[in-house]
């Protein structure tokens, strides 16, 4: 077997549809576009969301809300995820190194969810009451 003798299995590569090449091809004359109308023309189609001049649904519905800039740089971390951090000190950089949070996160709050198996020292992160109790029960401590 050589590279120049390789060929695809028979029937695995159907031939491309060639439109407008005579009535015998089955796609001659109108080329599968039907007769007349906007969609039969070259470049003739309406943009997505266009409703024929009627006020589009997107514009009929009211605007509401916004995306808080603070939420883009804030994250909540579960207690169970602290196990992924190597070492016993948990801070912003160690969470990023363990891929628990993304690099653009600046503020982290640790929440009570799951179990904490090892004693850890939490530095410079916000902690909920329940999470604080669980960390201290596991033999860890919280430093501001």
UniProtKB/Swiss-Prot annotation:
Cellular component, GO annotation: cytosolic large ribosomal subunit
Q: Name one GO biological process term.
A: translation
Q: Which species does the entry assign this protein to?
A: Vibrio atlanticus (strain LGP32) (Vibrio splendidus (strain Mel32))
Q: How does it assemble?
A: Part of the 50S ribosomal subunit.
UniProt region (Disordered), positions on chain: 1-58
- For bias type Gly residues, the affected ranges are 21-31
Task: Extract the Gene3D superfamilies matched here.
Answer: 3.100.10.10
Which region is the signal sequence?
none
Q: Which InterPro entries match?
A: Ribosomal_uL15, Ribosomal_uL15/eL18, Ribosomal_uL15/eL18_sf, Ribosomal_uL15_bac-type, Ribosomal_uL15_CS
Write down the HAMAP family for this protein, in alphabetical order: Ribosomal_uL15 (MF_01341)
Q: Give the protein family.
A: Belongs to the universal ribosomal protein uL15 family.
GO terms (molecular function) for this protein are: rRNA binding; structural constituent of ribosome
Carries keyword Nuclease?
A: no
Record function comment: Binds to the 23S rRNA.
Q: Provide the organism lineage as a comma list.
A: Bacteria, Pseudomonadati, Pseudomonadota, Gammaproteobacteria, Vibrionales
**Could you tell me the keywords of this UniProt record?**
Ribonucleoprotein, Ribosomal protein, RNA-binding, rRNA-binding
For this protein, the record's Pfam families field holds: Ribosomal_L27A (PF00828)
Protein name, as recorded = Large ribosomal subunit protein uL15
